[in-house]
């Protein structure tokens, strides 16, 4: 049975416990950092990271979810594009790096923060998770799935979920993912390869539609390469940074079910 993101969040407490048991024993965790890029100059909703949700800014809710998932505040970094976000995160004891507000994408912001953290901590990180700053109800299990796909060798990893609300199919604010699935595998182990992401209704014909969830994993070498590439034509046209990776021939793995 497929679960929506909202349904997943109802199981948060048990998932945090289960994920921490796996994560804290993992060798991958020693070489991994989770970064949350955030800036105030959003096109559709300016100042979104500071939007009040039950008395606290959205970015704080996201940060708390991620810290609960990985079990270590030291491995969670907010890559801020504005001093206002820095002030908020410092007030709650979060690690935060001020980055250039003119960087072209969240991934570029993540990379900038990564370099600073490696310098501060004296470590060389191998895996990077990018959690978008507008996911205040993020289920912790989704971070685990993103990490596991990196261990399978994809350049990048991300998540999709089947669209169950028909009104989302034609909504340009709901990014659709076109995925090639390994049909020979069982549903529990099936891994897909992202072919394209679009704000349009795609693909045509009968069959399910999938919406993209704003979390990415990167092999360090893949992120290094990504940030050396200029914003691609399709990235600029769709306003979707992951298209830069696809146009450059990089692979983005996605799990079949979340």
What does each model-found stretch correspond to?
Residues 7, 23-24:
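Low-complexity, intrinsically disordered or signal/transmembrane-proximal segments
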Residues 27-80:
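N-terminal glycine-rich phosphate-binding loop and ensuing alpha1 helix
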Residues 44, 137, 217, 239:
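Short aromatic/basic micro-patch
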Residues 77, 83-131, 135-145:
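Short phosphate-binding loop-to-helix
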Residues 138-232:
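Conserved core of the sugar-phosphate nucleotidyltransferase
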Residues 221, 242-258:
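Catalytic donor-sugar/metal-binding loop of nucleotide-sugar-dependent glycosyltransferases
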Residues 230-240:
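Donor nucleotide-sugar recognition loop
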């Amino acid at each position: 049975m497929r679960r929506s993101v909202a349904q997943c969040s109802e199981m948060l407490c048990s998932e945090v416990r289960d994920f921490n048991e796996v994560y804290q024993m993992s060798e991958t965790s020693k070489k991994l950092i989770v970064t949350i890029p955030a800036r105030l100059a959003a096109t559709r909703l300016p100042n979104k990271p500071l939007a009040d949700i039950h008395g606290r800014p959205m970015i704080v809710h996201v940060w708390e979810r991620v810290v609960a998932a990985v079990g270590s505040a030291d491995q969670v970094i907010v890559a801020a594009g504005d001093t206002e976000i820095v002030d908020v995160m410092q007030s709650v004891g979060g690690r935060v790096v001020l980055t250039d507000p003119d960087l072209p994408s969240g991934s570029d912001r993540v990379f900038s923060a990564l370099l600073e953290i490696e310098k501060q901590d004296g470590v060389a990180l191998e895996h990077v998770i990018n959690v978008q700053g507008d996911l205040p109800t993020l289920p912790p299990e989704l971070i685990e799935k993103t990490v596991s796909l990196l261990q399978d060798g994809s350049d990048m990893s991300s998540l999709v979920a089947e669209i169950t609300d028909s009104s989302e199919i034609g909504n340009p604010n709901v990014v659709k993912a076109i995925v090639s699935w390994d049909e020979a595998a069982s549903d529990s182990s099936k891994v897909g390869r992202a072919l394209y992401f679009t704000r349009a209704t795609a693909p045509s014909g009968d069959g399910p539609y999938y919406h993209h969830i704003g979390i990415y994993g990167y092999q360090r070498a893949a992120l290094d390469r990504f940030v050396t590439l200029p914003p691609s034509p399709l990235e600029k046209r769709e306003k979707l940074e992951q298209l830069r990776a696809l146009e450059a021939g990089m692979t983005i793995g996605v799990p079949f079910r979340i």
